Amino acid sequence: MKNCWFITGTDTNIGKTVSSIILLELARRYGYNTSGYKPIAAGCRTNDFKQYNSDAVLLRKFSTVKLSYQEVNPYLFIDPVCPFFTNEKNHMNVCMNKLSSGLQRLKKKSNWILIEGIGGLHTPFSNEFVMSDWIKKENLKTILVIGIKLGCINHAILTQKAILSSGLEFFGWIANYLLPTDTYNLTHIDILKKNMKSPYLGCIAYTPNIYNQIHHIPITIKLPLQN
């Protein structure tokens, strides 16, 4: 499947979910049958005696295809820590084949899929594999979300090297403004444009309560497509 995208970030809490939701909304506006996929999530809440991850709930909400929670998020860990740690603690193992079978189910229902990673590109899930191993196995096109703040240039360049050295396709990058005002936002982006080896897809302005406005706000990010 051509339009199947993997979102990774330079760090945690830098805008992977916001970027994912905006891209799902943009693909909806273009008329695609969209599915969001969060194969592994750490940190959950409980409602009506059911456990869920808030990022996965948002991906499900903004998918145009009707999906069960389990289809969006097959692996859910209670503690908001690295899955490798919770694997060891709870004697659980993340199976790469389960991640792949979940993706295959979504491919049968959708023609545009957005996969949101957990942590960073090399987040370990066991002694045998890290996130980038599965991305490569599935031949997914990678989009990097860069949270614009002090230190982001170094983080972005290091993550870019990790993407390329892992043999992944680096399709593009998104700048996410983490602060309402920052004198150096444009300076950061100008420097990133000179150092990134993939296209700049656009920026996301700092927008409080963005999820409540998503259907109405203008979106300036370019929709990643492959014909």
Curated annotation (Swiss-Prot):
<feature type="binding site">
    <location>
        <position position="17"/>
    </location>
    <ligand>
        <name>Mg(2+)</name>
    </ligand>
</feature>
<comment type="pathway">
    <text>Cofactor biosynthesis; biotin biosynthesis; biotin from 7,8-diaminononanoate: step 1/2.</text>
</comment>
<dbReference type="InterPro" id="IPR004472">
    <property type="entry name" value="DTB_synth_BioD"/>
</dbReference>
<comment type="similarity">
    <text>Belongs to the dethiobiotin synthetase family.</text>
</comment>
<feature type="active site">
    <location>
        <position position="38"/>
    </location>
</feature>
<keyword id="KW-0067">ATP-binding</keyword>
<feature type="binding site">
    <location>
        <position position="116"/>
    </location>
    <ligand>
        <name>Mg(2+)</name>
    </ligand>
</feature>
<feature type="binding site">
    <location>
        <begin position="116"/>
        <end position="119"/>
    </location>
    <ligand>
        <name>ATP</name>
    </ligand>
</feature>
<dbReference type="GO" id="GO:0004141">
    <property type="term" value="F:dethiobiotin synthase activity"/>
</dbReference>
<keyword id="KW-0436">Ligase</keyword>
<feature type="binding site">
    <location>
        <position position="55"/>
    </location>
    <ligand>
        <name>Mg(2+)</name>
    </ligand>
</feature>
<dbReference type="GO" id="GO:0005524">
    <property type="term" value="F:ATP binding"/>
</dbReference>
<protein>
    <recommendedName>
        <fullName>ATP-dependent dethiobiotin synthetase BioD</fullName>
        <ecNumber>6.3.3.3</ecNumber>
    </recommendedName>
</protein>
<feature type="binding site">
    <location>
        <position position="55"/>
    </location>
    <ligand>
        <name>ATP</name>
    </ligand>
</feature>
<dbReference type="GO" id="GO:0009102">
    <property type="term" value="P:biotin biosynthetic process"/>
</dbReference>
<keyword id="KW-0460">Magnesium</keyword>
<dbReference type="Pfam" id="PF13500">
    <property type="entry name" value="AAA_26"/>
</dbReference>
<dbReference type="GO" id="GO:0005829">
    <property type="term" value="C:cytosol"/>
</dbReference>
<comment type="subunit">
    <text>Homodimer.</text>
</comment>
<keyword id="KW-0479">Metal-binding</keyword>
<comment type="function">
    <text>Catalyzes a mechanistically unusual reaction, the ATP-dependent insertion of CO2 between the N7 and N8 nitrogen atoms of 7,8-diaminopelargonic acid (DAPA, also called 7,8-diammoniononanoate) to form a ureido ring.</text>
</comment>
<keyword id="KW-0963">Cytoplasm</keyword>
<dbReference type="InterPro" id="IPR027417">
    <property type="entry name" value="P-loop_NTPase"/>
</dbReference>
<dbReference type="GO" id="GO:0000287">
    <property type="term" value="F:magnesium ion binding"/>
</dbReference>
<keyword id="KW-0547">Nucleotide-binding</keyword>
<keyword id="KW-0093">Biotin biosynthesis</keyword>
<feature type="binding site">
    <location>
        <begin position="13"/>
        <end position="18"/>
    </location>
    <ligand>
        <name>ATP</name>
    </ligand>
</feature>
